Amino acid sequence: MAEEQQNSDQSNGGNVIPTPEEVATFLHKTVEEGGWEKCWEEEITPWDQGRATPLIVHLVDTSSLPLGRALVPGCGGGHDVVAMASPERFVVGLDISESALAKANETYGSSPKAEYFSFVKEDVFTWRPTELFDLIFDYVFFCAIEPEMRPAWAKSMYELLKPDGELITLMYPITDHVGGPPYKVDVSTFEEVLVPIGFKAVSVEENPHAIPTRKGKEKLGRWKKIN
C-alpha cells in the first residue's frame, strides 16, 4: 500500500510529475506562443497533480483553515477548490483559462459539494468581487507569473482579503534553477512583496506533506492581513 501511495503521489494520470527545471524548459515555449489557455487546450499541464494538494487535505481534515469565504487564484482543474469546500466554507476557484474551468466543471460539476463552490473566469489582477474573502490559498500561481508582476500579485491578495483575513502560500519551487515558469522562489521572495503592504508572517515551515518529487522544495507560509 505504501508503494502504491508513493506511486500515486509521484504521478499525474500515470505520468511522473517532472521537476521544476523540466517543467520550465517544457512550458516556456508553449506559454510564450499560446499562453496558459493553450496549455490547458492541449493538456500540457505537468503542474497538475490530478487530485487535491495533500497539504490542503491535511489542513481540512484537522480543521486548520479559516471558515467563511475562500479563494483559490489560478485554480486550474479545481481539485483544491473542491477539497476546501464545505457548508461552512464557500470556495471560489478563479482562472483565466476557459479550458481549465471547463475541465474543472466537467470533473466536479456533479459533486455533492457543488453548492459550496464555484468556478469563475476572471483575471485576479483586475477582478473586483462584491464580497471579500476570509482566506486565499496560493500554490503554483505565484511561481507561474512573471517576477515583475509579484508586487501586483501582493496588492491583489491584500485587496481581496477581508480585514484580518489569511493568505496561505505554499511556496514552490524553492530551488536554484534558472528561468520559468515555474520561476524559483524562496521565503524572502514573498516577504519582499507582502510585508511592506500590510501582511505579517504568522508561521513559515517546511511542508511535511509534499509529494516525493517536491520534498525539500516547498514551505508553507501563513500570513495575516494586519492593516
Curated annotation (Swiss-Prot):
A GO term from the CC aspect? cytosol
Q: What happens when the gene is disrupted?
A: No visible phenotype under normal growth conditions. Increased sensitivity to thiocyanate in medium and lower methyl halide emissions.
Q: Which domain of life is it from?
A: Eukaryota
Q: Which gene encodes it?
A: HOL1
Instruction: Please write the reaction equations for the catalytic activity of this protein.
Output: thiocyanate + S-adenosyl-L-methionine = methyl thiocyanate + S-adenosyl-L-homocysteine
**Pfam families in the record, alphabetically?**
TPMT
Task: State the taxonomy lineage.
Answer: Eukaryota, Viridiplantae, Streptophyta, Embryophyta, Tracheophyta
Q: What are the recorded Gene Ontology BP terms?
A: defense response; glucosinolate catabolic process; methylation
Q: List the protein's name.
A: Thiocyanate methyltransferase 1
Family membership: Belongs to the class I-like SAM-binding methyltransferase superfamily. TPMT family.
Residues recorded as bearing Phosphoserine in the entry: 86
Group of enzyme by EC: transferase
Binding of S-adenosyl-L-methionine occurs at 36, 40, 47, 74, 95, 123-124, 139
Role: S-adenosyl-L-methionine-dependent methyltransferase. Involved in glucosinolate metabolism and defense against phytopathogens. Highly reactive to thiocyanate (NCS(-)) derived from myrosinase-mediated hydrolysis of glucosinolates upon tissue damage.
Q: Which UniProt keywords apply?
A: Methyltransferase, Phosphoprotein, S-adenosyl-L-methionine, Transferase
